[in-house]
Amino acid sequence: MDNKEIIHILSEYGIDGFSDKTEIDSTNGDDYRLNVIIDKKYVLRINNAVMTEERLASIDRLVEKYRRIGVLAPRLFKNKEGDYLSAHGDHVCYVSEYLDYPLWEEKENETDVETIRKEVLRSIGRLSKKSSNEDLSDVMSMWSIIDLAPLDVDVDEKQENLDLLVENLKGLGETELAHEVEAFNDNARERIRALYKDLPRCVIQGDLNASNILIEDGHFVGLIDFNMAGTEVNVNHFCCETNEEITEEDFAEKDADEVYENWKREQQEMLDVILSEYQLNDLEKKAIEDYRRICRISMYPNVMSFIEYLKRDKEKTIKILRRIISD
């Protein structure tokens, strides 16, 4: 991008010139995305006119909520007109703070995974305790069930995943089990619907992974990338972030009961980390197991594993699925 263009845009935000820039172009077809890191202080973000002033204002308020609990997050800047967005040809642009810390994915071999995981999980508990039912967004998080997230079409992602699992079971001649899985899912969702509107929720970053977690000296310090931010029911958020996984090693070496019990134990251990910072109310205590049931049977990585494991050892995988739906 031409330096004069950058200087002109930055001047609208009260930033006078720059000495260094790094351009990151992640454009995909018609989806134009250009980020320009300026002097490791600012990020100029240019994309299609899909981002709105209201959405950026909501993200900026969320950033302050994270900072309030001791988690760094990039603030947004307003231009001289008092707006976050500025026009740039056929696109729009805005400016965010640059946080000069390494990403976790860059330091994974130098950090203790369990330490970072637990620090991140504790921050989830702190955020939920501090911000529940405060300044909620109309946009739902990608974890959402019942209400749809922006990328959902007709059904939420977990229902879509479950439908894929059911289709695979039927294709293997396991029609009875497929119907049982559907009934299990429907019953859990029906119980959640009865409580749904009264469950505490808050706005979350919504896409925690090693590519947007910042670390310093082996510890979690902050988050970037709030494009997937949205409102989420706290206990659903907790279950999704503590899903863990049935590892290939466990699946290969242990029987179905051991695999399932190990998975359950790991999930509870990680959930307990969140709950060291957050106390469930009575309604959440009633709902959390049904959210966990839905996560186990229909989160994307789980369904992909089940489909693969059905190919490797159908009998063992069916036993695991039956443990899930009988629990």
PLM features: residue spans?
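A cross-family kinase active-site recognition segment
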Residues: 111-173
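An alpha-helical support segment within catalytic cores of ATP-dependent transferases
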Residues: 2, 6, 136, 157-205
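Active-site acidic catalytic loop and adjacent metal/ATP-binding pocket
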Residues: 28-39, 189-236
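Helical subdomain adjoining the active site within ATP-dependent kinase catalytic cores
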Residues: 302-327
